Amino acid sequence: MKNVTDSFVSLGHWPSAGSFGFNTDILATNLINLSVVLGVLIFFGKGVLSDLLDNRKQRILNTIRNSEELREGAIEQLEKARARLRKIEIEADEFRVNGYSEIEREKLNLIDSTYKTLEQLENYKNETINFEQQKASNQVRQRVFQQALQGALGTLNSCLNNELHLRTISANIGILAAMKQITD
């Protein structure tokens, strides 16, 4: 670095030849060069710079406008979605209420059906019991009748002898003959 500054210092020892020469004062030359460059840039670059800034401004404004439009569209879609959600919630509540009432109706129908079935089974049971009681009563009657008949036959057989038996048969034959004559 020291060599670079020494070379600039050695340039300062050259003799100046009239009005043109090297200005070795770095600070003075930089300021002059900078002011010339800035002046040229401002004079010629003013239009380009303003065009660039205008283009950039338009792009920013377009981006803002697009963002606003997208935001408004998103808000609109959000409102539509909220409206659909409210509608669906209302329908879901209606389905839930209808479903509960339908379930309640089905439950009552099932209970009624069960009671009817139980009543029918109770009636069948009572009919079966009555039938079995009648059957048992008939069997008891038949048994009593058979025993009474056997007892009567036993009594008759023990009381009847052959002679009494023959007279009873003859009397019955006479009755049958008389009935035959009446019918002829």
Swiss-Prot record:
GO cellular component, one term: chloroplast thylakoid membrane
A GO molecular function held by the record: proton-transporting ATP synthase activity, rotational mechanism
UniProt membrane topology term: Single-pass membrane protein
Presence of the UniProt keyword Thylakoid in the record: yes
UniProt keyword terms in alphabetical order: ATP synthesis, CF(0), Chloroplast, Hydrogen ion transport, Ion transport, Membrane, Plastid, Thylakoid, Transmembrane, Transmembrane helix, Transport
Family: Belongs to the ATPase B chain family.
Remarks, miscellaneous: In plastids the F-type ATPase is also known as CF(1)CF(0).
Protein name (record): ATP synthase subunit b, chloroplastic
UniProt lineage: Eukaryota, Viridiplantae, Streptophyta, Embryophyta, Tracheophyta
Gene: atpF
